[in-house]
Curated annotation (Swiss-Prot):
Keyword Zinc: yes
Enzyme class: isomerase
Protein name, UniProt field: Phosphoheptose isomerase
Function of the molecule: Catalyzes the isomerization of sedoheptulose 7-phosphate in D-glycero-D-manno-heptose 7-phosphate.
Cofactor remark: Binds 1 zinc ion per subunit.
Primary location: cytoplasm
EC numbers: 5.3.1.28
One Gene Ontology MF term: zinc ion binding
Quaternary structure note: Homotetramer.
Amino acid sequence: MDMQHRIRQLFQASIETKQQALEVLPPYIEQASLVMVNALLNEGKILSCGNGGSAGDAQHFSSELLNRFERERPSLPAVALTTDSSTITSIANDYSYNEVFSKQIRALGQPGDVLLAISTSGNSANVIQAIQAAHDREMLVVALTGRDGGGMASLLLPEDVEIRVPSKITARIQEVHLLAIHCLCDLIDRQLFGSEE
């Protein structure tokens, strides 16, 4: 097996998926940034959730807002619902793993807040329940999905935003999700604090 050849194949596949995403995602990423900025300007916050790699993405996004992205600026209110192991395990034990995010949203979410819901398949049951809870709390939803959008896509309201990666391969979807998250962080900073150029 030629490992360097395989590495080149993987790089090329990632590049091609990003090129395909570039053709379709910019308006949705822009709209998502506007939704998030509007919430932040109106004293709202952004909650985020996902499983596995998507949980890591939720935490990555939250940390970029709470700390900083690529410039010095005030901290922005963002909470990853994936980080408190005591809360997650108590809900999973006493109720169901499908409720680990929705119960947190019912406690922490307020009208005007935004939920960043991340799932490569769009079919994660606990993320689907998180979207339902967010709507119950009069929150808007930004969904990062892939494939056909799954069950998440069918739950979204007209004012919500879906950023659906045009791929069926989990690794490629995750790579574009990370790029979309970095785009959102950049656009949020620019809209709130101006361009550094």
